[in-house]
Amino acid sequence: MFHMIVRKIFSLLSLVLSCAAMGQTITPEIEKRAVELVAQMTLEEKLAYIGGYNGFFIRPIPRLGIPEIRMADGPQGVRNDTHSTMYPCGIAAAATWNRELARTYGHSLGQDARARGVHIMLGPGVNIYRSPLCGRNYEYYGEDPFLTSETAVAYIEGMQAAGVMATIKHFCGNNQEWNRHNVSSDIDERTLHEIYLPAFRKAVQKARVGAVMSSYNPVNSIHTTESRELIIGVLRGKWNFKGIYMSDWTATYSTVGAANNGLDLEMSWGQFMNPDKLRVALATGTVTEETIDEKCRHIVQTLIAFGFFDREQRDWSIPEKNPVSSETALAVAREAVVLLKNDGDMLPFSRKIRNVVVMGPNATNIPTGGGSGFVMPFETVSVAEGIRNADKRIRMKVLAPELSVDLTARGGFFTPDGKPGLRGEFFANPKLEGNAVGTVDATAIDFFWQNAPMEGVPATQFSARWTGTFIPSVTGQAVFQISGDDGYRLYIDDREIIADWYDHFITMKRASVDVEAGKSYKVRLEYYNAWDSGTLRMCSACHSPILPQQEIESADAVIYCAGFDSSTEGENCDRPFSLPQQQLKEIAEAAMLNPNLIVVVNAGGGVDFTPIVDKARAVLMAWYPGQEGGRAIAEILTGRINPSGRLPITVERRAEDNPTFDSYRANVAQVYNSPLRVSYDEGVFVGYRGYDRAGTEPMYPFGYGLSYTTFDYANLKMERLDDGNVVVSFEVTNTGRFAGSEVAQLYVGDEVASVPRPEKELKGYEKVRLEPGETKSVEIRLSPDAFAFYDMNRHDFVVEPGDFTISVGASSRDIRLSEKIRID
């Protein structure tokens, strides 16, 4: 049934794509219309137009019929003051290795945007996974430029077919979050074009993406909002991009440099490209009005091409809570989960599995990455809920803190005069200054303010403070989780345990403190709203750190839900390679009590699996699987779904094994010096390319993933066509007892080259669904690009005549078929 639904969605999508594709082409007629409109704009209108306003908008010019344009973050759901479908994260989409599903994902997200009147979505993110430490790896599509490109193109085509402009980001070299505004990514020309730029190029040339967003970091010491070489030379020149080039939010660093070197639109507002500063530049001749006109034309012609001037963007026929979107989120989650270990066929659960313990920090939590990963879904399914619903014969015990917004539960919170809840004071300014306008008691901190929170307090630019005491019901750990936009911070006994005290969109932070049952702890929660609507939510729970031995020992299986979340992995910071020590301690203790341990890991990339794999009989990499993730994981555990996810990354045994380990961060001693630089010394040998060159055995190779069935490969054939393409065909057979999907991967290796080249590079793949005993023929067409490398003397890709090895297999280290071919 699931596969029928996905095929039906995709059939409709194919029709939409065929009808809508021409709408994204900037034709000479559209360019002429844009020129005429810009000619009618006053200088003041033009100077204001190239700076965003109200956070996520391009300003309207009503007298010319130029509409207000609404943008929304992000790649895995419509954010910004709305509930919406929370899809699996980007790296999960890549782990499906399914172009059709990526296209459906993009289209469903586009439909969600149309239901809310959003014109431009700020995604996908395609920065290459260079190291597991980068805090935003979860947003991206893995370590390989081909897989990243294929996934991104499909996603963009789907989204833009829905009538929503996609924005590919972050252009480019944004491969770490640590000190991202200041650290230069020093990348040689060949490495840029072979590894870090292909997804952007294909998005422009194949998917015809409407917008490109800059990165925060400099590349080769020049910020990408003012890099003439990258914007005008590569993006506009080599690739003939005619769309909008916008800055990331507060990623513009000068007026003249940005204006003269290709930036069209400064977001979220014109800090540097604003009328006051640009008038000075015009008066001194450092910027010309023609340069300003060109920016306005780029913006206007792109908006016209997408139909935004000629129709209402909100589609009232699409429900905001869309069951089709939920089904898409579930479909992606089902295919994204990677089965890493399954000793003794622990999975799927046999009929003997009747009593199950579910534990760990993510058992009842819906983990996401921080920043753009935080979407407010209408509904969610945790792993515990998923298992409860998947098989009614299974009796389940949950040993995990169940977070609640109810301030009167689990011991409870009390106002200063002893009433249940916390006492809130509201201030008519964002700094908690002066006397409170009013007070109100709350039994739950769960607010979404679209208007003033109380009389006498403005709708924006206000602050609030809640105070009281917390008396836990058990001795152990109290867990606090806060989500909100703009600033929030939490103090327990005057010690700050959570802080996100700056202007921002919705984020989520979590912290734990040791507590004693019956003891009173002072609580102070502070919040401010800077602009637009306000959101604040606090959940809490108490649990004992001592594992209940009898319950774990007597269970038929124990499922431990481990990993990171938005508090520990997200934007503007990097994260550790190791899982939190408390989790590793609990995993070890659970394994000693019960050998049937299954570990489910939530993370945006590789982690140190060494302390896990020796203790668990089964391990699943679930990424951040979105609102339906718990249901998908439960279906895989119980055998309703055969896992088909494959790693879009290489997972190292040790952090030191990663090819970038020695050069990932700038020298710490340089933190207070300028400039800060990270040299990409590994060159093109990132990911599996580097492991192959070094002869290092990874923990799990690129493309790896287990299934409940087995597959054989046979009959490799190759045919060279007159147009220079090569057609590779082979057969895949399901040799096991379960229906399942295999990801057949094709790698190309140059036998002799004038420059150092990787042993093999992914150049094709197909996901093939097979019934038990079924054989299918797979055909992959290779263009000359599959054999090329970037020549720094010619500043272009070249194919050197010679012998190449075509390898086909189940991962980069599991090659089943190979044969040489001569390319002249």
Task: Give short role names for the model-derived ranges.
Residues 815:
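Conserved glycine-rich phosphate/nucleotide-binding loop
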Residues 1-26:
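Bacterial Sec-dependent N-terminal signal peptides
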Residues 21-479, 483-792, 798-812, 822:
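Glycoside hydrolase catalytic-domain context in secreted enzymes
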